[in-house]
């Protein structure tokens, strides 16, 4: 018959160390921890097989297609320095395996099934190389960094934000008042917390109205463009779109979405709506630590960040390096560059396993948020540079005199740090002197 049934080792078909990767391949770097007795080549090949064309046995229908054309290939394996029984397995996927413009489909293929695999003790997706041929099928961020600056008329400094606290329990009117005080004091943006959607104590429509009122009042009094990230995340895509439409009708500049809990399909729909209707889109990464916190299992945040740039968002939370949530400096700056820059060189010391060419896909502003305050300002200005959003929740509202003085303090500290930097002073060394001097006037 010509068909030979039976179970074969994956590595016979899917481990191909002599394979030359193509410019159109999607490349993945997996951190593989095989079960005892499973050779790393077999583990790497198993990942390649199960995330592409393979199954546990040879099947009759394999003969009806060209496996060589469609199969994923594990083309290189290296041990992880300093770790026992951990390997980086590099896998190449032919572009034809993926639907155009669908982050959902890309993830379903690459990480959909392999993580429960018996032969592996643990598996982590460390990085993806997205070829231009694939990234060009995505719209990407609704507007990007330059267009956002032009819309807001704010240049040469990071933007300032603040998450309104207490995150749950305020009425819409009181919430709007808190927004107004922060914006009036000098912040560029205020923010709905990620879990503020439409609860019994504050329905979304009421919140949108009072926040819009606060924005327009603060704009009129300061002469600056202001915004509040109105969280459009909802239980259905239709409801989410309804909220975004209402925000557009109010004439506000920006809405917000929780892209991991909301899902990539919803996020991409919202990003398309935002581009078509001139809304900026702020992205919160609620649930990311469930996926990315374990060092040897899950998906590294740099992959989730790349996926967001493809799906679409103008801001995304990216850790602080200095605040209350964890993040190592070089690694964080690695994916901050992946969000902002057009071309990023491979650099293993920053966790970047592949050179990434975004071919003019718009950039995303990284948002530093979580446990930061005025005294972190010199470090944040130096680490993140101008193209970022610095978000102080408790660091604004926790000011002993209240919201507006807290906002003033943040704006003064930021302007002082930017000026000092532009004058050539060393923020890391002199930061603690710059801020008290600025606060005197």
UniProtKB/Swiss-Prot annotation:
It holds the Pfam family RuBisCO_large. CDD domains: RuBisCO_large_I. The record marks 324 as: Transition state stabilizer. The disulfide bond which can form in the large chain dimeric partners within the hexadecamer appears to be associated with oxidative stress and protein turnover. The active site is at residues 165, 284. The modification N6-carboxylysine is found at residue 191. Substrate binds at residues 113, 163, 167, 285, 317, 369. It catalyses: 2 (2R)-3-phosphoglycerate + 2 H(+) = D-ribulose 1,5-bisphosphate + CO2 + H2O; D-ribulose 1,5-bisphosphate + O2 = 2-phosphoglycolate + (2R)-3-phosphoglycerate + 2 H(+). The keyword Nucleotidyltransferase does not apply. It is found in: Plastid, Chloroplast. It is an enzyme of class 4 (lyase). Its main location: plastid. GO terms for biological process: photorespiration; reductive pentose-phosphate cycle. Keywords: Calvin cycle, Carbon dioxide fixation, Chloroplast, Disulfide bond, Lyase, Magnesium, Metal-binding, Methylation, Monooxygenase, Oxidoreductase, Photorespiration, Photosynthesis, Plastid. Mg(2+) binds at residues 191, 193-194. GO terms for cellular component: chloroplast. InterPro entries: RuBisCO, RuBisCo_large_chain_AS, RuBisCO_lsu_C, RuBisCO_lsu_C_sf, RuBisCO_lsu_fd_N, RuBisCO_lsu_N_sf, RuBisCO_lsuI. Its EC number is 4.1.1.39. Binds 1 Mg(2+) ion per subunit. GO terms for molecular function: magnesium ion binding; monooxygenase activity; ribulose-bisphosphate carboxylase activity. Its cofactor is Mg(2+). The modification N6,N6,N6-trimethyllysine is found at residue 4. Belongs to the RuBisCO large chain family. Type I subfamily. HAMAP family: RuBisCO_L_type1. The basic functional RuBisCO is composed of a large chain homodimer in a 'head-to-tail' conformation. In form I RuBisCO this homodimer is arranged in a barrel-like tetramer with the small subunits forming a tetrameric 'cap' on each end of the 'barrel'. This is Ribulose bisphosphate carboxylase large chain. It comes from Heliamphora nutans. The lineage of its organism: Eukaryota, Viridiplantae, Streptophyta, Embryophyta, Tracheophyta.
């Amino acid at each position: 018959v010509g068909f030979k049934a039976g179970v074969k080792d994956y590595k016979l078909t899917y481990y191909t160390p002599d394979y030359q990767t193509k410019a159109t391949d999607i490349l993945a770097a997996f951190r593989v921890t095989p079960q005892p007795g499973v050779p790393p080549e077999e583990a790497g090949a198993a990942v390649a097989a199960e995330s592409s064309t393979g199954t546990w046995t040879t099947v009759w229908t394999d003969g009806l297609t060209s496996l060589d054309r469609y199969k994923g290939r594990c083309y290189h394996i290296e041990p992880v320095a300093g770790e026992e029984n951990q390997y980086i397995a590099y896998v190449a996927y032919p572009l034809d395996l993926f639907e155009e413009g669908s982050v959902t489909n890309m993830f379903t293929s690459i990480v959909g099934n392999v993580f429960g695999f018996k032969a592996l003790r643990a598996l982590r997706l460390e990085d993806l190389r997205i070829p231009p041929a694939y990234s060009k099928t995505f719209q990407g961020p609704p507007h990007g960094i330059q267009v956002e600056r032009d819309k807001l008329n704010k240049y040469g400094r990071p933007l300032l934000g603040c998450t309104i606290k207490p995150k749950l329990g305020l009425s819409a009117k009181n919430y709007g008042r808190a927004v107004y005080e922060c914006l009036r004091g000098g912040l560029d943006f205020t923010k709905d917390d990620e879990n503020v959607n439409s609860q019994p104590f504050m329905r979304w429509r009421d919140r949108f109205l009072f926040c819009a009122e606060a924005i327009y009042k603060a704009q009129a009094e300061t002469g600056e463009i202001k915004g509040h990230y109105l969280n459009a995340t909802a239980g259905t895509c239709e409801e989410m779109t309804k909220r975004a439409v209402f925000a557009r009708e109010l004439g506000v500049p920006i809405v917000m979405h929780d892209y991991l809990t909301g899902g990539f399909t919803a996020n991409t729909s919202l990003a398309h709506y935002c581009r078509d209707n001139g809304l900026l889109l702020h992205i919160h990464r609620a649930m990311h630590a469930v996926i990315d916190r374990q060092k040897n299992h899950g998906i590294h945040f740099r992959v989730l960040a790349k996926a967001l740039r493809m799906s679409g968002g103008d801001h995304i939370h990216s850790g602080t390096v200095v605040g209350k949530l964890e993040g190592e400096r070089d690694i964080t700056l690695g994916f901050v560059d992946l969000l902002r820059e057009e071309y990023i060189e491979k650099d293993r010391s920053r966790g970047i396993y592949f050179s990434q060419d975004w071919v003019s896909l718009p950039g995303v502003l990284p948002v530093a948020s979580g446990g930061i305050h005025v005294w972190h300002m010199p470090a944040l200005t130096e680490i993140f540079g101008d193209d970022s959003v610095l978000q102080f929740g408790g660091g604004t509202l926790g000011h002993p005199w209240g919201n507006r003085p807290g906002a003033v303090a943040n704006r003064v500290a930021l302007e002082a740090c930017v000026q000092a930097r532009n004058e050539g002073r060393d923020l890391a060394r002199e930061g603690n002197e710059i801020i008290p001097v600025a606060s005197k006037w």
